Design a protein with these regions (language model features):
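Residue-level recognition of pore/gate-forming positions within transmembrane alpha-helices
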Residues: 31, 57-61, 111, 155-158, ...
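Hydrophobic alpha-helical transmembrane segments
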Residues: 24-28, 50-55, 79, 104-109, ...
Length: 183
């Protein structure tokens, strides 16, 4: 908000609450509660070693939004999104006690592609304001048409990756067929 992106949105917490104080507290409380809950789950399941994978993802998520030059303002914003969401899937896969293999990798790619496709799908209407705020998002760099094409391609890739995850993970036959037809 301080950097000018999304300032035109009238329903933002910053505008509704006349400043960043409430939004900052909301972020601190949400982050603290999520971290505590996640740590309790890892302790209960005796999988604290997953913190070795999860902690860098948390730091990457923080850097995406905070600091003097957030990653969301750079050309790395979309990559950071994909790495974080793919990594979260991998952590959840490991937490479920499944061995990391081709199915996990396909699922991580699916989550990453879904996340980036969703991010890209929201960028075209914000090109002018993002450019004015100094953001270097994919849409600012490549324009509306290319952004939409890439978002659709990532969505299709995500569906194929998810089907591969289901197939490789043991859901064969009718379940995978129904999912494939629905996609």
């Amino acid at each position: 908000w301080k950097r000018g992106a999304d300032a035109e949105k009238w329903d933002s917490w910053v505008r509704v609450h006349n400043g960043t104080r409430i939004a900052n507290w909301h972020g601190v409380i949400s982050f603290s509660a999520g971290s505590l809950l996640g740590l309790l789950v890892l302790m209960a399941t005796h999988t604290l070693w997953i913190l070795g994978v999860a902690a860098p993802l948390v730091m990457l998520g923080y850097l995406y939004n905070a600091g003097p030059r957030p990653l969301s303002y750079t050309q790395l914003g979309e990559w950071a999104t994909g790495v974080c969401y793919g990594g979260v899937f991998a952590c959840l896969w490991l937490l479920a006690g499944k061995p990391f293999g081709a199915a996990a990798l396909a699922g991580a790619f699916a989550f990453a592609a879904f996340a980036v496709a969703l991010l890209l799908s929201h960028q075209p209407p914000q090109i002018a304001t993002d450019r004015a705020a100094g953001k270097h998002s994919f849409a600012v760099r490549y324009g509306t048409e290319r952004t939409i094409i890439v978002a659709r391609g990532l969505f299709a890739f995500a569906l194929v990756s998810l089907a591969a995850n289901l197939w490789l993970g043991g859901l064969r036959g009718m379940g995978t067929l129904v999912f494939g037809l629905a996609a």
